[in-house]
Amino acid sequence: MERFELLARLGFAPPEACRMRVIIDTDAKNEGDDDFAILHHLLTPQFDVRGICATHFEVKTTQRGLPPHSMERSYQEVCRLLNAAHIDDVPVLHGCTAPLASPEDAPDCEAVEFLIQEALRDDPAPLYIAAQGAVTNIAAALNRAPEIASRMTVLWNGGGPYPAGRPEFNVQQDPIACRVLLDSAVTVWQIPVSYTHLRAHE
């Protein structure tokens, strides 16, 4: 079933004038919250979800003795989720399998090529990258094609609480990629970890 067919069945019609392109970059197998975020994107009528890129959480798997190949497990989790939702028109891309080796590292993979291709597409709709894990794929794409920086906006769920800061999970999975992203010319909307927590009013 196509995503917009599902939206139509739910009574939603995507307003073309407000359409924005979205690519989701996710470590979906790491925690269950990514699945909810993915479905939220897919069921938002204004979002033209162009694809979903799987990213790794290899630092966690190494430190905690968990099964390796975290990117592949995230890829399979996204496929499972789309299958359960009967959505078959959104491509899922394999991402980088490990953190960047250096600030100049530019590994090639399906996700990196897809990010570059979509950023360079001749399309008036703005492109947003919803980053829900390590930003390795995005940083590698910026290293391979710096010209895409002005053609997309990255919404990054990562970084310690503002303004004090502290080590944070998504940063720890690839701190070099975070530095590449923040040093680039791309517009970044950062959502620190403290803004993802619900708290009672004091």
Q: Where would I find each of the regions flagged by the language model?
A:
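Internal, conserved structured core segments that host functional sites
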Residues: 116-149, 155-156
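Short, glycine-rich nucleotide/cofactor-binding loops
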Residues: 24-33
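Glycine-rich nucleotide/cofactor/substrate-binding loop typically near the N-terminus or early
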Residues: 20, 43-121
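Conserved small/polar residues in nucleotide/adenosyl-binding loops
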Residues: 196-202
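Histidine-anchored nucleotide/phosphate-binding helix
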Residues: 34-44, 139-143
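Positively charged, low-complexity intrinsically disordered leader regions
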Residues: 1-14
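Active-site glycine-rich loop that binds ribose-phosphate moieties when present
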Residues: 111-112, 136-137, 155-182
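Flexible, glycine/proline-enriched loop segments at strand-loop-helix junctions
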Residues: 64-68, 101-106, 125-131, 162-172
